[in-house]
Amino acid sequence: MCDEDVAALVVDNGSGMCKAGFAGDDAPRAVFPSIVGRPRHQGVMVGMGQKDSYVGDEAQSKRGILTLKYPIEHGIVTNWDDMEKIWHHTFYNELRVAPEEHPVLLTEAPLNPKANREKMTQIMFETFNTPAMYVAIQAVLSLYASGRTTGIVLDSGDGVTHTVPIYEGYALPHAIMRLDLAGRDLTDYLMKILTERGYSFTTTAEREIVRDIKEKLCYVALDFEQEMHTAATSSSLEKSYELPDGQVITIGNERFRCPEAVFQPSFLGMESAGIHETTYNSIMKCDVDIRKDLYANTVLSGGSTMFPGIADRMQKEITALAPPTMKIKIIAPPERKYSVWIGGSILASLSTFQQMWISKQEYDESGPSIVHRKCF
């Protein structure tokens, strides 16, 4: 279908960040916030060549005069006009390519509604005139990136967490679990517990600082109660962090109390099961004959699985839930923050994949519903 010399574009649209680049590369060229900002008041920026909307980093830096919107909520696109702006920005400003010259591989959340897949397909062919496109499930791409076709993926990003069992390259929809608890909630929780310590973080700018503290200093305790005891009786776990204004703050048990919420959602006032139990529940919804393969191939993916100690803790928790003789292996690839994108880069450059693309011709003949026949 497509010439060998034209690289496919791979775009992974997350709730928090958009990752984009060229198939065959080992990392995305562009990573920017999935936000669209519009001026709060017309004419505030007279003479500044004011645009009617800003995307990504530019929206982030001008947020004082803008109203910011996230078009992707909990992994699912909810605002198509803004989503179109993000894609336009991706192609023309970040990658600087003409989308009508490249096949485009997009990613979607597990259990993405059918209408959404059709809308994505329609926008790619009708607005951007792409010659070919494909929609792949994010967790499946992460599994490919780890060199597997069977396993269970715990994918936790900024807006949503999923556990997705995959057998021979196909996600098993009946066993997919979704948990609306992810990076954004952990940042909010850290803001809250730092406020209890007497530090005030309230504005969106301060929220970015807290996110940085979370990414640099937080970790998952192997034994939460014991870690709390250690923190209470010594200062060995305390770390200091310098704020942009030069003030230095000290953070102690908050370092592991924050990510503990993914194992104990009750910390956030949520009634759901933690990620370990959710993973176990997903496995138990699968055929008894494939469970062994899932336990032995549990792959972590997404930015919110980057906490040090999370793999060991998962190993411990799942071992406690699983049958006693079961072999359990948690795989935490170092590049897992971008493993969805990397899996897409691998998939789109496989020679065997080239016949899988939906071509413009097929789209013109069948319409948007073609996506359900060709992407599964």
UniProtKB/Swiss-Prot annotation:
Post-translational modification comment from the UniProt entry: Oxidation of Met-45 and Met-48 by MICALs (MICAL1, MICAL2 or MICAL3) to form methionine sulfoxide promotes actin filament depolymerization. MICAL1 and MICAL2 produce the (R)-S-oxide form. The (R)-S-oxide form is reverted by MSRB1 and MSRB2, which promotes actin repolymerization.
Keyword terms: Acetylation, ATP-binding, Cytoplasm, Cytoskeleton, Hydrolase, Methylation, Nucleotide-binding, Oxidation
Catalysed reactions listed for this entry: ATP + H2O = ADP + phosphate + H(+)
Coiled coil: none
One of the Pfam families matching this protein, by short name: Actin
GO MF annotations, alphabetized: ATP binding; hydrolase activity
UniProt EC number: 3.6.4.-
Protein name as annotated: Actin, cytoplasmic
